[in-house]
Curated annotation (Swiss-Prot):
Keywords recorded for this protein, A-Z: Amino-acid biosynthesis, Cytoplasm, Histidine biosynthesis, Isomerase
Main enzyme class: isomerase
Keyword Cytoplasm: yes
Positions annotated as active site in the UniProt record: 8, 129
Entry protein name: 1-(5-phosphoribosyl)-5-[(5-phosphoribosylamino)methylideneamino] imidazole-4-carboxamide isomerase
A Gene Ontology molecular function term of the record: 1-(5-phosphoribosyl)-5-[(5-phosphoribosylamino)methylideneamino]imidazole-4-carboxamide isomerase activity
Biological processes annotated in GO: L-histidine biosynthetic process; L-tryptophan biosynthetic process
Subcellular location(s) per record: Cytoplasm
Entries under SUPFAM superfamilies matching the protein: Ribulose-phoshate binding barrel
GO cellular component, as recorded: cytoplasm
Record-linked PANTHER family: 1-(5-PHOSPHORIBOSYL)-5-[(5-PHOSPHORIBOSYLAMINO)METHYLIDENEAMINO] IMIDAZOLE-4-CARBOXAMIDE ISOMERASE
Disulphide linkage map: none
Length: 237
């Protein structure tokens, strides 16, 4: 199982939100490039970058920071937030981003997802962000009339190969991930599942590995020191 540190970008800084609430922000650094360097030096196999301002506005905001991270280290980066058009996805990939993560577009424009998967294959991942079992969009500020499970089924029909699942109520809480809901999305012939939200201990990671996820995105727990990236990586080599 791959352990992936998260860097969430807001106002040019590295932050974490509590349950996706833009009014509950904790700043963990003013230099996201230096933070990226730290995680790569700790052995991170890739980084999960989220342009929070982009997610809320509908178009990428932190392009310069993302470019600097990608070009400074030459290591794999996956990017989400504000990627709601084919052009935005193409520009992100041109920056050197290895994998783009689409959330709102998956709900609102499934035809676009099908086009992108056909064109870019593994470079396209879909974020299924759930609040009370229902898919959330627009930087988690809106809730769609579609369940997370139904959204997964739709993505399967479109050929999506990788899904990042987040239970919003757990995100940024350090409580624990929603193991049951995450495991319900894992199918032998389905897309690879990456878990996110509430992960803060090695036991959480082990339980996620037991249900068959491909990877786990860890944010706040790494910044608070509740979880050591080196220890987590060593446990899942």
């Amino acid at each position: 199982m791959e352990i992936i540190p998260a860097i969430d970008l807001k106002d040019g800084r590295c932050v974490r939100l509590y349950q996706g609430d833009f009014q509950q922000v904790t700043v963990y650094g003013d230099d996201p490039v230096a933070i990226a360097q730290h995680w790569f030096e700790q052995g991170a196999p890739r980084l999960h970058l989220v342009d929070l301002d982009g997610a809320r506005s509908g178009q990428p905001v932190h392009t310069d920071i993302i470019r600097a991270i990608v070009r400074s280290f030459g290591a794999p980066v996956q990017l989400g937030g504000g990627l709601r058009s084919i052009e935005a996805v193409e520009r992100a990939l041109e920056l050197g981003v290895q994998r783009v993560v689409l959330g709102t577009a998956a709900v609102e424009h499934p035809d676009m997802i099908a086009h992108l998967v056909a064109q870019f294959g593994d470079a396209i991942a879909v974020a299924i962000d759930a609040r009370n079992g229902m898919a959330a969009t627009a930087g988690w500020t809106e809730t769609a009339a579609m369940s997370a499970v139904d959204l997964l089924e739709r993505m399967v029909t479109l050929g999506v190969r990788r899904v990042i699942y987040t239970d919003i109520s757990r995100d940024g809480t350090l409580s624990e991930p929603n193991i049951a809901a995450t495991g319900a999305l894992v199918r032998p012939d389905g897309p690879a599942i990456i878990a996110s939200g509430g992960i803060s201990t090695l036991d959480h990671l082990r339980r996620l590995a037991d249900v068959g996820v491909e990877g786990a995105i860890v944010g706040r727990a790494l910044y608070t020191g509740d979880l050591s990236l080196r220890e987590a990586l060593a446990a899942f080599q």
